[in-house]
């Protein structure tokens, strides 16, 4: 693999490491602390006041690294970075409103979904009308592609909305979403490089490197949370990269933890509405394992191991 990929990881890592000690005290000073849901695990109540919006750290590290390393980024790399930033902005607005209102209620669900759908439409429309991306996607474990035609735009809109929300739901334990997304982005570094998308592989590498640096401050016990600023940005980046590579279906495999977290919430809600009973002790899934007696670090470790296995399976899907 090109040595530039290694440099990309290292540059972003060190920028993220340097940014942390600057931003964390600033957020403390501004009293940008996380409000913890009362209905969440009792062990999480002590986390109240931990600075949020930490996604700013790895977003800045990624942007700065890209402009340091690549003088003329390709359209596809810029597309991924625009998605990264655009969804991050929605998350930032949500985080800011939560802090301003001093509760865990930021944007209303409908407001947030409308913003996500509008931004998703913009990227879906661009992709459908870009000959380098087109309206077809690769079917895993086969040499075939599926052309969505006129259904491509609605499919991609739902795909972006689902991916961003899934990463957002996964961000419930110290270092969980960070660790999982480092592995997912590492997978896409290798795949995009092997498919000839070199500048896109650099984007994936700097994102992974920036997250590695951020993990120093986000791992248990977290000094800062990424907030919706970070989780929505990461969801947008993962969705955009996979869309460019025509691999939205592969995200279901490598992002299996994202999928399970989301399904656990859906199953919990449907079960409670239909039967009045809960399938899980608490959703999303990571909280269920917490209430089963698992420590946060064990949940993160096991989910990360599962993601490594899923990435290996995803590699086998390429013929």
From Swiss-Prot:
Subcellular location: Cell membrane
GO molecular function: metal ion binding; phospho-N-acetylmuramoyl-pentapeptide-transferase activity; UDP-N-acetylmuramoyl-L-alanyl-D-glutamyl-meso-2,6-diaminopimelyl-D-alanyl-D-alanine:undecaprenyl-phosphate transferase activity
Family: Belongs to the glycosyltransferase 4 family. MraY subfamily.
Name of encoding gene: mraY
A biological-process GO annotation: cell wall organization
Catalytic activity: UDP-N-acetyl-alpha-D-muramoyl-L-alanyl-gamma-D-glutamyl-meso-2,6-diaminopimeloyl-D-alanyl-D-alanine + di-trans,octa-cis-undecaprenyl phosphate = di-trans,octa-cis-undecaprenyl diphospho-N-acetyl-alpha-D-muramoyl-L-alanyl-D-glutamyl-meso-2,6-diaminopimeloyl-D-alanyl-D-alanine + UMP
Name the UniProt record assigns to this protein: Phospho-N-acetylmuramoyl-pentapeptide-transferase
Source lineage: Bacteria, Bacillati, Bacillota, Clostridia, Eubacteriales
Pathway(s) it belongs to: Cell wall biogenesis; peptidoglycan biosynthesis
Main location: membrane
